[in-house]
A protein has these predicted regions:
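Alpha-helix-loop-beta-strand connector modules within alpha/beta enzyme cores
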Residues: 218-229, 383-400
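Active-site-adjacent beta-strand/loop module that shapes the phosphate/pyrophosphate-binding cleft
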Residues: 87-117, 131
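Catalytic cores of alpha/beta
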Residues: 238-248, 263-264, 342-354, 405-420
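Nudix hydrolase/Nudix homology domain
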Residues: 43, 47, 119-199
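Conserved N-terminal beta-strand and adjoining loop/helix that marks the start
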Residues: 2-34, 87, 102-105
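Glycine-rich adenosine-cofactor-binding loop
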Residues: 341, 384-387, 397-409, 413, ...
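Conserved Nudix-box catalytic region and its N-terminal flanking loop in Nudix hydrolases
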Residues: 29-72, 229-231
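Glycine-rich phosphate-binding active-site loops on the catalytic face of alpha/beta enzymes
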Residues: 277-280, 367-378, 412-431
Length: 431
């Protein structure tokens, strides 16, 4: 059955003179992804693209998706689970384009039926692209599709490390009994899945000393387990010493192994994590700056203007706390943001849109929690799947379900709008 529980996906889009709404279908079977090919005479021609097309006035995005895929390729996806990945907003001056992106996994029977089809019903070439080649830019895509590739790197399941406090009481016979940090390292070195995604956090009280301590412990784990795709607290991004990490990594490999020097581009850090508190602190500052612009900024104010640019460009060029929009900062790594309510999701959407406008690394996803009751936060009232799904529909980026879940609940989570499920205990399988 199609995933029609998404309240936004099932609402017809109102007519707009400026906004062109487009439904985009990321169709795949396991690691094979369907791409069309834009003809040379088309805008951004001679490039591959995900199939889809314009959403008609008063048509729902999901209905448009099913119709466009059928008209372009002949594929019938009406019975498949249709997962919202996100929405991308582009301003071209004379018009605005909103891409509504959905992910659809074909059954084995559908794939066998469709895989030999070399051309669509509009005579466009069709190609099945291997995911690894697709993510490594083997297939040139329009610039607007680059964020989609970052989203596709997300796994089905994601591990979260235990807080350091969990290791303050040693197990019987533990030789590292006096050092919780070493026990934390030993446990996660052994238990984090090989080449898996892992959110590395120790949950220490924030202080300068603890920032350095947390960065040092995480650096040691990254040196030992450089295979993982790590998510690291955003506040540690300047505390991690790349040279020290490189030295530690070399200490853990044979002298004959040729390892590149580590830097921002080849670190095993796939994303930085923002807490909801950090997000809302940024958003409050953003709103103050926006109000300042609305009231008429003085030319001597500390704002970066281009006199030929419109207000939106001036808006996103302001300097904010956390440097989240600073084009000269190290913003080449994407973000994952924790959200717990509609207000924080709206703030995350705003940040995602501004970073897209500035061509910064995208907001890859949000953590939305808690879905169910948890042992770690028994005081928090769980959302339940119905409320969780309604909130997930508001997000312009993929949503990671968190709170009381296990990997076995992945399919249920997908039906409710989750791209990924995450947790602590049951998500750490060992190497």
């Amino acid at each position: 059955m199609p995933n029609n529980s998404n309240p936004i996906s099932n609402q017809p889009l109102a007519e707009s003179l400026k906004v062109v709404n487009v439904a985009v279908a990321v169709i795949h079977y396991q690691q094979q992804y369907l791409l069309g090919y834009r003809k040379r005479e088309q805008h951004q021609g001679d490039r591959y693209e995900f199939v889809g097309g314009k959403i008609d006035i008063n048509e729902t995005p999901v209905a448009a998706l099913i119709r466009e895929v059928k008209e372009e390729t002949g594929f019938n996806i009406a019975g498949n689970v249709i997962l919202k990945l996100g929405r991308l907003h582009h301003d071209y001056g004379d018009k605005q384009v909103a891409l509504h992106i959905y992910k659809i996994e074909l059954s084995a029977e559908q794939y066998q039926h469709y895989k030999q089809q070399e051309y669509g019903l509009e005579a466009q070439m069709l190609t099945w692209a291997d995911k690894d080649l697709l993510l490594n830019n083997h297939y040139p895509l329009p610039a607007a599709n680059r964020t989609i590739l970052a989203w596709l790197k997300l796994p089905k399941c994601m591990a979260i490390t235990y807080p350091l406090a969990h290791f303050e009481t040693p197990d019987s016979g533990d030789s590292l009994a006096t050092n919780p940090a070493q026990r934390w390292l030993k446990y996660h070195q052994q238990q984090l899945s090989y080449q898996g995604w892992s959110y590395l956090r120790l949950k220490l009280a924030q202080s300068n000393n603890n920032t350095d301590k947390e960065a040092e412990i995480i650096t040691q784990l990254l040196a030992i387990r450089s295979d993982i795709s790590a998510i690291v607290p955003y506040r540690l991004r300047k505390a991690i010493d790349f040279n020290h990490l490189d030295d530690l990594k070399n200490d853990n490999i044979s002298a004959s192994t040729n390892q590149p020097t580590l830097n921002q581009d080849n670190l095993p850090i796939s994303a930085y994590h923002l807490t909801q508190t950090e997000l809302m602190a940024w958003f409050s500052q953003y709103q103050k700056q926006s109000s300042h612009l609305d009231s008429g900024a003085d030319s001597n104010d500390d704002l970066s203007y281009d006199s030929s640019s419109n207000r939106a460009t001036a808006e996103v060029s302001c300097r904010f706390d956390l440097d989240l929009l600073n084009t000269s900062d190290q913003n080449t790594t994407g973000l994952i943001i924790s959200c717990h309510d509609a207000e924080s999701i709206a703030a995350a959407n705003q940040l995602a849109n501004l970073r897209l406008t500035l061509s910064l690394a995208p907001v890859i996803a949000i953590f939305l929690s808690p879905v169910l009751a948890t042992q770690t936060h028994p005081e928090q009232t769980p959302l339940g799947w119905q409320q969780w799904s309604a909130l997930a529909a508001l997000a312009d980026v993929p949503v990671i379900a968190l709170g009381g879940l296990s990997p076995a609940m992945s399919d249920l989570a997908t039906i409710n709008g989750a791209n990924t499920v995450a947790g602590i205990r049951s998500f750490q399988e060992g190497v």
